[in-house]
C-alpha cells in the first residue's frame, strides 16, 4: 500500500506526528493514522519526501520507521537526521551509524528517498536521485514495520510531498498537484462552498488525466482543507475509476478530509457522493 500527502500546512499545528491505527491512505493532521503493515511485504519499507531547511543551523531528526520486536527482542528503529554541520546521518536507536556525504544547504528543496530492508539488512539514502549513503550492517532480523514518523514541529525545516509504502516506489517518484473542474453540484453562497443536506448528491471532477508533464500516474489522492459532516450527511463515498472508499467527514474543529487510491493509472471518473 502507498500512503501520500502533499500538503504541508496540514501539519503546522500538531508537532511530531507518529502514525498508528488504520484508516485510509491519506496522511493527515487530524489523527487519520495508518499502519504501514503488510504481513508479506512489511519488511521492505520505502519513504520519500521533499525537505527544505530554513535555518543555517540544524541538529534535527526528520523522518523514519519503527519496527516490531522479533522473538521478544527489540529491533532498532531507523531514522534520518541532519547534524549540526548540516550533514545527513542514518541513525539506529538514536545513535549515528553512518554520516552520509550529503550536506544540506539552506533555502533549497531536496527530494529525499529512504529504503530500509530488514531481510537484506540494508539502509540506503538517496537525495535528488543520487545515492548519498548506504549502511550494510543493519541486523537481518526480517522485522516488519509497525509505524513511522515525520518530525514536523521543527522551526528549522519544512517537509512536503510525503510518500510511504511497503510496495513499489521509485527514487524519482513524487507528488504533483493538479487542478480539476467541478460539475453536477451547486455552489452554496451562504456556506461559501459546495454543500448539501441530501443523501445521494454528487460532485463530479473533470477531466481525465493519464500523464502529467511526462510523469506516469501510480497513485492518486484528493483532499479538502475545509470539509465538515452534518447529522444528515456524516459521510461521503469517493470513487475513482473502478475503486471507491467511504470516508466519514470530520466534525468540530477538524476539517481535513480526503481519500487516496494506490495502483491507479489515471485520474478519471472521480465522483464524491453524499452518504449516510
Task: Label every model-predicted segment.
Residues 1-17:
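Short, tryptophan-glycine- and acidic/Ser/Thr-enriched carbohydrate-recognition patches
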Residues 15-33, 86-87, 190-198, 245:
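Short carbohydrate-recognition loop motifs
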Residues 28-88:
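Secretory/extracellular carbohydrate-interaction modules
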Residues 47-49, 108-117, 123-125:
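Short tryptophan-centered beta-strand motifs in secreted/extracellular beta-sheet-rich domains
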Residues 90-111:
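Short, aromatic/His-centered strand-loop micro-motif at the edge of beta-sheets
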Residues 167-276:
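Disulfide-rich extracellular domains of secreted proteins
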Amino acid at each position: 500500500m502507498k500512503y501520500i500527502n502533499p500538503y504541508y500546512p496540514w501539519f503546522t499545528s500538531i508537532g511530531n506526528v507518529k502514525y498508528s491505527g488504520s484508516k485510509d491512505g491519506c496522511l493527515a493532521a487530524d489523527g487519520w493514522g495508518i499502519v504501514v503493515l503488510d504481513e508479506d511485504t512489511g519488511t521492505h519499507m520505502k519513504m520519500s519526501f521533499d525537505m527544505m531547511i530554513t535555518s543555517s543551523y540544524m541538529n534535527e531528526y526528520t523522518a523514519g520507521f519503527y519496527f516490531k520486536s522479533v522473538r521478544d527482542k527489540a529491533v532498532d528503529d531507523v531514522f534520518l537526521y541532519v547534524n549540526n554541520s548540516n550533514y545527513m546521518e542514518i541513525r539506529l536507536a538514536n545513535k549515528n551509524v553512518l554520516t552520509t556525504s550529503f550536506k544540506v544547504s539552506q533555502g533549497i528543496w531536496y527530494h529525499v528517498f529512504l529504503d530500509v530492508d530488514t531481510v537484506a539488512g540494508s539502509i540506503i539514502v538517496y537525495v535528488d536521485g543520487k545515492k548519498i549513503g548506504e549502511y550494510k550492517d543493519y541486523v537481518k532480523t526480517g522485522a516488519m514495520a509497525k509505524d513511522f514518523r515525520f518530525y514536523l514541529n521543527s522551526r528549522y525545516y519544512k517537509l512536503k510531498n510525503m510518500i510511504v509504502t511497503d510496495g513499489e516506489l521509485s527514487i524519482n517518484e513524487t507528488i504533483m498537484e493538479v487542478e480539476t473542474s467541478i460539475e453536477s453540484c451547486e455552489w452554496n453562497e451562504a456556506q461559501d462552498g459546495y454543500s448539501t443536506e441530501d443523501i445521494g448528491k454528487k460532485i463530479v471532477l473533470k477531466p481525465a488525466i493519464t500523464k502529467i508533464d511526462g510523469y506516469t500516474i501510480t497513485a492518486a489522492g484528493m483532499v479538502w482543507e475545509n470539509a465538515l459532516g452534518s447529522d444528515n450527511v456524516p459521510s461521503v463515498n469517493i470513487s475513482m475509476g473502478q475503486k471507491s472508499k467511504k470516508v466519514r467527514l470530520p466534525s468540530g474543529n477538524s476539517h481535513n478530509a480526503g481519500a487516496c487510491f494506490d495502483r491507479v493509472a489515471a485520474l478519471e471518473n472521480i465522483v464524491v457522493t453524499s452518504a449516510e
